[in-house]
Amino acid sequence: MTQILIVEDEQNLARFLELELTHENYNVDTEYDGQDGLDKALSHYYDLIILDLMLPSINGLEICRKIRQQQSTPIIIITAKSDTYDKVAGLDYGADDYIVKPFDIEELLARIRAILRRQPQKDIIDVNGTLLKVTVNGAEIELTKTEYDLLYLLAENKNHVMQREQILNHVWGYNSEVETNVVDVYIRYLRNKLKPYDRDKMIETVRGVGYVIR
């Protein structure tokens, strides 16, 4: 499901947008404070961010700039500022679109659909076997060596169910004396680290057999 973050301090408008977007089958998070919104944007995976400019703690332009330093998540600015200077500044700071309040909800929904259509289809996760790192939407996830080896094995065998014994042999070694339940423990570790990016469900359990990434 498409993940959208709303950062808007006008609570009535924010709730209205959340209701409308949820009705359109988007999964929505909402923050009313600029710093809270920035923290959420940088720590979770989102397909699109709807961002007001005039916010408590930190303004929308600064949020946009900081997000662009780390990731390329599409951003739509919604604001009462209608001057050409403000529009140019918003786009130059990294926004993908700029809508002046008040606006028609149907126009916003159409712009969201248009931006999402333009986004390239990416693998939900990038497991780099050369650099030994894992990124989701440009954000690097810290993993232990064992966690990385386990995720890399599953990613390299995408759509192929890996038995617990196979995983144990590849990750821990054929002569390892650890029990197969250690695989379940490390799968749980991985899911917990992927959960903030809404990627924990990418590792599926095949009951009585093992695990697979679809």
UniProtKB/Swiss-Prot annotation:
Localisation: Cytoplasm
GO cellular component assignments: cytosol; protein-DNA complex
SUPFAM superfamilies per record: C-terminal effector domain of the bipartite response regulators (SSF46894), CheY-like (SSF52172)
Superkingdom classification of source: Bacteria
All copies of domain Response regulatory, residue ranges: 3-116
Pfam families, per database record: Response_reg (PF00072), Trans_reg_C (PF00486)
Protein name from the UniProt record: Response regulator ArlR
Primary subcellular site in the record, as a coarse category: cytoplasm
An example molecular function term from Gene Ontology annotations: phosphorelay response regulator activity
Keyword terms of this UniProt record: Activator, Cytoplasm, DNA-binding, Phosphoprotein, Repressor, Transcription, Transcription regulation, Two-component regulatory system, Virulence
DNA-binding region: 113-214
KW Transferase (keyword) present: no
Record bears the keyword Repressor: yes
Organism encoding this protein: Staphylococcus aureus (strain N315)
Function (record text): Member of the two-component regulatory system ArlS/ArlR involved in the regulation of adhesion, autolysis, multidrug resistance and virulence.
Residues with 4-aspartylphosphate modification: 52
Any single GO BP term: regulation of DNA-templated transcription
Gene3D superfamilies: 3.40.50.2300, 6.10.250.690, Winged helix-like DNA-binding domain superfamily/Winged helix DNA-binding domain
Modification comment: Phosphorylated by ArlS.
Organism phylogeny: Bacteria, Bacillati, Bacillota, Bacilli, Bacillales
